[in-house]
């Protein structure tokens, strides 16, 4: 069976694919409501090196849903802040908070209801279920800060690792995990992005560090083997019959 994993950062082409799969009953969409970016723009020259991009079309799913969310009643700032507002309304933790327009409910060939109004609403919802501190930690882990930390740590302490056996690296935990946590917390503090380490997120931090080590030493495939172990979306897909 086909599962497509999406969240609020999924935009444009990924939404076209997710919408087509959902509308044709070919698979399940797992995650959270997507960004809602479905405009077609054409770049036109004005002369002297100047150019302007004109919106010439919109992307629609097979049932007729417009992927683009409304923007005509909001300012540019409000438009890009809409995803942040989903945290305020509770949508990130509760799918019942997703705004539904009754006039924009569509039906697939097999009778499943799908929803328009901007973005792709998933079939199976994955809640953030996170506090503000946890969301902040996720932001840091998702930034390039952890990648830089791993690069510097490997440069200084590569002698502490044995990378000859990839499978052994995958199966074993990092050497001196507490030392890694302390070093990363100090590194974040020096970069003015303090991270709060708790029992709950310690495993995620170590897993992310290990994944980025694998990316720099081995390859992208090994990175994802490690990173996906704690990925809520992947776990939910694996649990789905």
Predicted regions and their residues:
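Generic hydrophobic-segment detector
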Residues: 26-28, 39, 54, 100-101, ...
């Amino acid at each position: 069976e086909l599962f497509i994993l999406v969240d609020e950062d999924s935009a444009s082409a990924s939404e076209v694919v997710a919408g087509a799969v959902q509308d044709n009953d070919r698979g399940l969409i797992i995650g959270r409501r997507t960004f809602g970016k479905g405009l077609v723009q054409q770049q036109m020259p004005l002369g002297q090196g100047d150019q302007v991009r004109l919106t010439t079309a919109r992307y629609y799913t097979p049932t007729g849903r417009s992927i683009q969310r409304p923007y005509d009643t909001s300012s540019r700032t409000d438009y890009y802040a809409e995803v942040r507002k989903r945290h305020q309304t509770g949508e990130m933790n509760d799918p019942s908070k997703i705004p539904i327009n009754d006039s924009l409910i569509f039906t697939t060939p097999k009778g499943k209801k799908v929803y328009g109004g901007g973005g792709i609403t998933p079939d199976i919802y994955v809640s953030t279920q996170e506090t503000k501190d946890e969301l902040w930690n996720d932001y840091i882990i998702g930034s390039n800060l952890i990648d830089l930390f791993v690069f510097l740590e490997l440069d200084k302490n590569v002698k502490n690792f044995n990378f000859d056996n990839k499978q052994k690296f995958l199966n074993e935990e990092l050497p001196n995990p507490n030392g890694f946590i302390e070093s990363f917390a100090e590194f974040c503090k020096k970069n003015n992005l303090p991270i709060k380490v708790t029992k709950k997120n310690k495993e995620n931090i170590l897993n992310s560090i290990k994944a980025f080590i694998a990316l720099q030493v081995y390859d992208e495939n090994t990175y994802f083997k490690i990173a996906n172990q704690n990925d809520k979306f992947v776990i939910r897909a694996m649990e789905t019959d």
